[in-house]
Structure formats: structure tokens, C-alpha cells
Design a protein with these regions (language model features):
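Acidic/histidine-rich catalytic neighborhood of metal-dependent amide-processing enzymes
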Residues: 1-59, 63
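Metal-dependent amide/peptide-bond hydrolase catalytic core
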Residues: 56, 63-206
Length: 206
């Protein structure tokens, strides 16, 4: 689009800045660096994959890590141990249950298909180092998404509550509760008024 404007010789009323940044998937440090360098604009368009749709809202993202403790034991005396992997699966199911609850309660007008907007899932499980022994720890890493207007602290608390409830149903975890921490990627959800001039201008030109 910018190339076409330049080739046409059209004169714009303002400046157009093309900013190519790194770190889009993890933390947005590239965009932050742009701001810290003093670049400002009346409006911006993020060229995120959208199927060429105008998207005036952006979900938030909270990464978390859950440490589940078991009791190590060798294969012959495994009955003396507590398999942290078995416990980990219970917590994985609890996180899945939280997603189902959120699908029924979290709504946003710009996200009619809410299942695409608010994933709550475990994407990584780390446990054990030897095939013939119960591991004493299981580390689960996952992601929780929020919609604009949603309280991030409340969303985090819902995860803590769900994990705690699941742990209370297990005799071992009741006495050895999993440890939840929020670490890594964290981004607040955001949106722009659909009546904002930049949104209406892009819509009218598209």
C-alpha cells in the first residue's frame, strides 16, 4: 500500500512510519523499544495475521507455571512413592475445566466465537528423567487468555482457585499443594472504539 502511494506521487497530510520490530510472540519488546526511542503516531495498524479482517480488539495473555510435587520411588518399590505425573494429569484436567467454565461466562461483543479468544491450556509438561522410577516433580506450563475489559487479577485468581480445588480432592496434594506462579509472557488485553476515526477510515477504504 505504501509503495503504491509513493509510486502514484500522492501527497499525504501526515507522515507514514513503517516500523518492523522483533519479539512479537514473547513480550513485545520491539514495540516497546520503538516507543522508548520517541516514535509516536496519531494511530497505528498492527499487521498481525487476521485474514484481512479489521480487528479493533486484542486479547490478553498470561503465562503460568505449576509445580506439582510427588514422592520419588524406584520401580520395585513404586508403591512407596507418589507419581508426580499422575498428579500432574489431575491438574491438567483442572485447567481444562477452568477453560470450560470461562467459555460459559466470559463474553465480548467483538469475539462472538469466544472459544478462539480465551484459551486456557497446558502446553508443556516436564517430569522424570528415568523410565524405571516415579518422578518426584512435574512442572506444567500453560497459557490463559483474557478479553478486553476483563480483570487480569481476577482471571489469575480463578486459576489459583481451580488448582487449589483440584488439589483438595487428592489426599497427597491436599497435604502437598501445587505451587502456581505467573511467569514469562504477560500482556493486558486492549481494544479501540469501533467508532474511532482510524477504524472507520480503514473500514471505508478496505
Amino acid at each position: 500500500a505504501v509503495k503504491s502511494i509513493m509510486e502514484s506521487g500522492s501527497k499525504l497530510k501526515g507522515d507514514v512510519i513503517l516500523d518492523f520490530v522483533v519479539d512479537e510472540e514473547l513480550s513485545g519488546h520491539g514495540t516497546l523499544d520503538t516507543i522508548l526511542r520517541g516514535y509516536t503516531a496519531d494511530a497505528g495498524i498492527c499487521c498481525e495475521t487476521s485474514g484481512n479482517a479489521i480487528q479493533p480488539a486484542c486479547i490478553g495473555r498470561i503465562w503460568f507455571e505449576i509445580l506439582v510435587r510427588g514422592k520419588a520411588a524406584g520401580i520395585q518399590r513404586r508403591y512407596e512413592g507418589v507419581n508426580a505425573i499422575d498428579l500432574g494429569y489431575k491438574i491438567v484436567n483442572a485447567v481444562s475445566e477452568l477453560e470450560q467454565k470461562r467459555l460459559k461466562t466470559v463474553k465480548h461483543p467483538l469475539y462472538p466465537k469466544i472459544i478462539d479468544a480465551i484459551p486456557c491450556m497446558i502446553g508443556s509438561m516436564e517430569a522424570g528423567s528415568f523410565p524405571s522410577a516415579f518422578p518426584d516433580t512435574c512442572i506444567l506450563k500453560g497459557s490463559l487468555a483474557t478479553v478486553p475489559g476483563e480483570d487480569h487479577d481476577a482471571a489469575k485468581q480463578s486459576l489459583l482457585d481451580e488448582v487449589r480445588f483440584a488439589a483438595l480432592q487428592d489426599p497427597w496434594m491436599k497435604e502437598n499443594p501445587p505451587e502456581v506462579k505467573f511467569t514469562g509472557y504477560y500482556a493486558e488485553s486492549a481494544e479501540i472504539d469501533v467508532e474511532h476515526p482510524i477504524v472507520k477510515t480503514v473500514a471505508n477504504c478496505y
